[in-house]
Design a protein with these regions (language model features):
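Nucleotidyltransferase catalytic core that binds NTPs
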Residues: 1-200
């Protein structure tokens, strides 16, 4: 099964642009998770084939200025999801809430430096896990060249065309959200995005 990962997750070691990387100690999966959905779960499960642990890091202040749902609620959703997948290897890391309070956003490079310091791991043992929706944005990341040099990257290709914005739009329009779009940890609390109809 581990060999199958090459077509689903591209592994890049720190300081390199290609080739096969060794397994990482920690994969850091940051994002709005607004809300988390089955596409996120798929990425997490595939990343576990490349990393010993996966940290789910919800954005507290978005680097590109997006407005997001309640931070504490998104943390609860991710913590529940982590427990269902594997509580020993997956966890929600709300570290962004306390990082760089004087800045408008927490950048990936700052986050990874903080996690390396907290965990005691050398930066090359940490990988930034990037979903398909953010892969094209990587060159726009703060200190992108340094980021790519210092830490590894796990690039997850999209296996289903599903994004959080699609769920939010359905709810704003008062339309039912397909059951296949919803995680069990989230579906009963989607009313926080407005609209009256839940998963159907």
């Amino acid at each position: 099964m581990r060999d199958e990962i090459s077509s689903r997750i591209r592994r890049l070691p720190a300081g390199m642009s290609g080739g096969r990387a060794p397994d990482f100690a920690l994969a850091v999966y940051g994002g709005a998770f607004d809300p988390p959905h089955p596409g996120h779960e798929s990425v997490i499960r595939r990343a576990l084939l490349c990393a010993e642990r996966v940290a789910l890091v919800p954005s507290h202040r978005h680097a590109f200025g997006k407005r997001m749902g309640d931070f504490e609620l998104r943390c609860r959703w991710l913590a529940r999801l982590a427990r269902r997948i594997d509580p020993r290897r997956v966890y929600c890391e709300p570290i962004e809430a306390g990082l760089m309070p004087d800045r408008p956003a927490v950048y990936s490079i700052d986050l990874l430096e903080a996690l390396a310091a907290r965990s005691g791991l050398a930066s090359p043992r940490i990988a930034l896990l990037i979903g398909a929706d953010n892969a094209a944005e990587l060159p726009r990341f703060e200190r992108a060249a340094e980021l790519c040099w210092r830490v590894g990257r796990l690039g997850a290709e999209e296996r289903r065309p599903l994004h959080s914005s699609m769920i939010r739009q359905r709810l704003r329009e008062g339309r039912a959200v397909p059951e296949a779009w919803c995680l069990p940890e989230v579906k009963d609390e989607l009313h926080c995005y407005g609209g009256e109809r839940q998963a159907g």
